[in-house]
Amino acid sequence: MGKIIGIDLGTTNSCVAIMDGTTARVLENSEGDRTTPSIIAYTQDGETLVGQPAKRQAVTNPQNTLFAIKRLIGRRFQDEEAQRDVAIMPYKIIAADNGDAWLEVKDQKMAPPQVSAEVLKKMKKTAEDYLGEPVTEAVITVPAYFNDAQRQATKDAGRIAGLEVKRIINEPTAAALAYGLDREVGNRTIAVYDLGGGTFDISIIEIDEVDGEKTYEVLATNGDTHLGGEDFDSRMINYLVDEFKKDQGIDLRNDPLAMQRLKEAAEKAKIELSSAQQTDVNLPYITADATGPKHMNIKVTRAKLESLVEDLVKRSMEPVRVALQDAGLSVSDVNDVILVGGQTRMPMVQKVVADFFGKEPRKDVNPDEAVAMGAAVQGGVLAGDVKDVLLLDVTPLSLGIETMGGVMTSLIVKNTTIPTKHSQVFSTAEDNQSAVTIHVLQGERKRAGDNKSLGQFNLDGIQAAPRGMPQIDVTFDIDADGILHVSAKDKNSGREQQITIKASSGLNEEEIQRMVRDAEANAESDRKFEELVQVRNQADQLVHGTRKQVEEAGDKLPAEDKTAIESAVAELEKVAKGEDKADIEAKIQALVQASAKLLEIAQQQAQAGATADAGDSAKKDDDVVDAEFEEVKDKK
C-alpha cells in the first residue's frame, strides 16, 4: 500500500507533507519551495501553469489567471460572498446552469473543483517525485467552518486530480495534530486560531494523554469562510487606488493590468509591514493619460495598514467568543494558543489574540506548514503507520429539516462529535397526504429560509391517513469527513428513500467523470509534450555537434559524405520545428547514419591525439634526471 499524503489546499498557498517514520515531512515542489501559490493560469498557447510560474505571468494575463478559488468552491452564484468576489476579481465569475458560481476562461466554463484539481495535481506530482512511486490516496484539509457543499466540492476536486480522498479533516484540527506529534503534551486545552488567505477558523481542542496514547477532542469550532488575507489585501489595494486617484485624478479600477500589478505590490507591502514600520509602494508606469506616463509612489506605515484592517481583526474575535462559550470554557481554561495561516504573522493580529487570551501565542508551530503536517499525521493514522492517536472532530453547523410553518428543526446540533447518527419521527401536515418532501438544511437560524439548503428529496407512497397519523422516521448520518447521508422511512408501509446529500448545487457524477477524463487527457498530452521537447532538444544537440565535427574534419571528410550530412542536418532542422515526434526521431537516425564516415574520422583523430600524447609523455620521462638527496633537519 502506497503512502497517504497530507494536503493543505489553501486559498493563497498550498502545501503537501508525508509521514517519514514518526515525523511529518513537508515536501519541496519543483521550484524548490515548501509552499505553492494556489494560482492557476491558462496561457494563450493552451498551456496550464500552476503555482509560481502562474503567479509570475499574472500581470500580463490577469483575466486568465485564477486565484483564491477556494472562496468559490461549493458556493451558489447568488451567495453574498460570491457576489463580493464577482465585484473585485479580475477574472470572470459566472452562474452555472445549476446556479453554482463557476468561472469562465477563454470562453470555456469551469467549475471551481476542476480548477482546484490543478493545484492538487501539482501536490500529487511533488509527492510522487519525492517518493519515486505513484500516489493515489490523500487526506485533504478544509476550513472547520466549511459546510457540506464545500466539503463535497473539495472531495470532487481530489477525484478530478486522480486522488482517492481517504479523509477530509478540519484545518485547525490538523494543526493540533502537528502540534502534539513530537511533544509530551499531557492533558491540555488548546485554541487554534487559523486566519488564512481566504477563511478564518477557531477551534477549541482538548488533548488527553494516557499511557502514551493521545486523544484530540474538538470541543467547539466556529469561523467565517469569507474572511482572510485576501480581504486585508483588498483594503490595502482600495487605499492605494483612492490615494492615486486623489493625486492624479485617474481611477485604476478600470485597468485590469494596473490592478494586477497593484495586487502584487499591496500583498508585498502588507508582508513587509509585519517587520518594518513603513514601506514604499513604488510602481513606475502604472498607467498613462494624454499628458504622458504616470507613476505610483506612496508611503504606507504600519499604523495606516492597521487602521485599514482593524475591523477585520475585530470581526475574527466574535467567533472566538462563541467557540469558547459553546465549549463551556473561559479564557483561563486555555493552556496554549496556536496561530495558523500566513495572515497571523501580522503583529496586530498576534497582539489582539494575545490580549484576548491573556497569554502569548506559541511561536514553535510553523503557521504555513502545520496544517499539511497534521494532514500527513492523519494519513499515517489511516494507513496504520501512526499508532496511539485518536481524533474526535465535530460538525461545525447544526443540521435539520424544514418543518411546518417554514421552521428549521435540528436533528444534529453544531459541535456534535462525528461520525454520528440521529433519528427523529415526523408526520404529515395534511389529511391523506401521499408524499412528503424532506428539505435538508444546515445553519443556526430558526427560519428555514435563512439557512443553507443542502438539497431535498421526496418520500412517496405514504398510505392515506388523517394528518399527524403516519410516522416518518428521518435519520441523519454524518460520516468522518463531515458529509451527510439522509434517509426517510414510512414506518407503516416500510417504504424508504435515502440520499447522500449533494446539494442542489455541486457537480453530478457525470460531470465529475468528464472532468476526471479531461484531467487524464491533459496529463497524457502533457507527457507527450514533454517527450516532444526532449526529442527536439536531442535533435538540436545532434545538429550542433555534427556541424562542429564537420568543421574539425575539414578536408579529411569526402565531399559526397559532407553533402549527405548537410542535407540530413537541413532535413532534421526542418522537422524539429514540427509536432511529429516519430518524424523527428526518424530524421535523427538518418543523420546518425549519414555521419558514419564523420564518426570514423573523429575516432581516428582521437586515437592519433592519444598516441601523440603518449609519445610526448615518454620523451618528458627520458629528460628526467634521477637525484639522490638526504633530509637535513634544522637545528633547534
UniProtKB/Swiss-Prot annotation:
Annotated region described as Disordered, given as residue ranges: 604-636
Bias (Low complexity): 604-615
Tell me yes or no: is Phosphoprotein among this UniProt entry's keywords: yes
A Pfam match is: HSP70
Q: Keywords for this entry?
A: ATP-binding, Chaperone, Nucleotide-binding, Phosphoprotein, Stress response
Question: What InterPro entries is this protein classified in?
Answer: ATPase_NBD (IPR043129), Chaperone_DnaK (IPR012725), Heat_shock_70_CS (IPR018181), HSP70_C_sf (IPR029048), HSP70_peptide-bd_sf (IPR029047), Hsp_70_fam (IPR013126)
Give residue numbers for the modification (Phosphothreonine): T199
Q: What induces it?
A: By stress conditions e.g. heat shock.
Superkingdom, according to UniProt? Bacteria
**Keyword tRNA processing belongs to the record:** no
Q: Which GO terms describe its molecular function?
A: ATP binding; ATP-dependent protein folding chaperone; unfolded protein binding
| Similarity section | Belongs to the heat shock protein 70 family.
Function of the molecule: Acts as a chaperone.
Q: Which PANTHER family match?
A: HEAT SHOCK PROTEIN 70KDA
Protein's UniProt name: Chaperone protein DnaK
